[in-house]
Amino acid sequence: MEPENAQGKSPAENEQEVVPDVASAMSASSEALEFLCSVGLEELNLCLFTDSLATVSVSGVELGNFAVSVQPAYYQLDGLEEEKCFLVHAASQGTIDGVPCGTSIIGHISYKLETLEQHVHEYVKLKGHSLDKKTQIVRQGDKLVINRIITEGEKLHRETSSHSTSLLSGLISEAANLLIMRILARRKIKDPLKFLAFDEEGNLCTSTYAPLGSQAQVIGKEMVDVFGIERTIHSPEVPTTWQCFFLSDGHLASHVQIGSPVTIKLNEMPVLSEPDEKDPKPVFEKKPLAWQEDLQLHSEFLDRKEELISDHETYLRRHPEVKVLLADFMQFLLLRKPDDIMDFAAEYFKPFSSTQEPNDPFVSSHHASPFRNVSH
């Protein structure tokens, strides 16, 4: 017999597929779909940079930091051939009203701006009571599967849902949003665009992007022009709106969620991203090695060593998410400081497995989400 959760439901009852008729009632606008088709690789490559900003209160007190990076990567799923894509990583951490909190987003985005896989981790560390939420989105065949794990104190809740990818044209995930906003800012869009999105509870809804025009902002000691975009996720419960302003090349200058007491601001002017001419590949001359022993043996040893190092470096370049995952894990490890590190690591990385079978008792999570995502 399957274990029941606090509401008397078995795990199987929490794994549900969205009804096609409900999902098909929502769609992205034709203008939004045309925009996605118009984005080329050359334009995307101009958005490969890192933003580093500070989170400040209304009174100007620095509360934490926020960073977003986009870099080239490779993605492979279910033994298929590797696909070139972009790795988007966003992380925010800080202390608001004396409460440590943070959000991490890791996503693989295709050249067509489709989400191949995404992991979102949010936490709030209250005194004697911690809240933790992990959400995974991954493509499995013709389905987009969403796995959510919510931990509140000692209580754990899991749920899984899926959507047919044929009904998700124009879907923009949180990771894809961070890349698309840079493109919209570079183009200085003139008209609103409507896409599909998921809200904080994993519900399918629409999201809109509307231009706010240009205004002046002080960054460091300079007064610069920035272009604003307002993004709204039209959740079935309560819509959420963010206002973001960008430099001419897509660097994020400021970001605020309407109703939030904190603002994310850029404190120093970055180097603007412009098209560059390709530099010729460097030619490295092999330096002669003076061996005192068997030359052939040492030569074979060094050749093999170089081959292994090159192979390892190539793998890390193709999979920059390795460093991202380890960095996020170390940050969370130092925050929690568990006694059993091995068990903690096993539990931390378990949700990243798309093949894991949920086997924990279910508890209710139908109350309002305590998380406040500041990474949109």
From Swiss-Prot:
GO terms for cellular component: actin cytoskeleton; cytoplasm; nucleus; plasma membrane. One of its GO terms (biological process) is actin filament polymerization. InterPro entries: CATIP_N (IPR048777), DD_CATIP (IPR047501). It holds the Pfam family CATIP_N. Gene3D superfamilies: cAMP-dependent protein kinase regulatory subunit, dimerization-anchoring domain. The keyword Zinc-finger does not apply. The keyword Zinc-finger does not apply. Coiled coil: none annotated. Residues 355-376 are annotated as: Disordered. Keywords: Cell membrane, Cilium biogenesis/degradation, Cytoplasm, Cytoskeleton, Membrane, Nucleus. It is found in: Nucleus; Cytoplasm; Cell membrane; Cytoplasm, Cytoskeleton. It comes from the Eukaryota. Its main location: nucleus. Plays a role in primary ciliogenesis by modulating actin polymerization. Belongs to the CATIP family. This is Ciliogenesis-associated TTC17-interacting protein. It comes from Xenopus laevis.
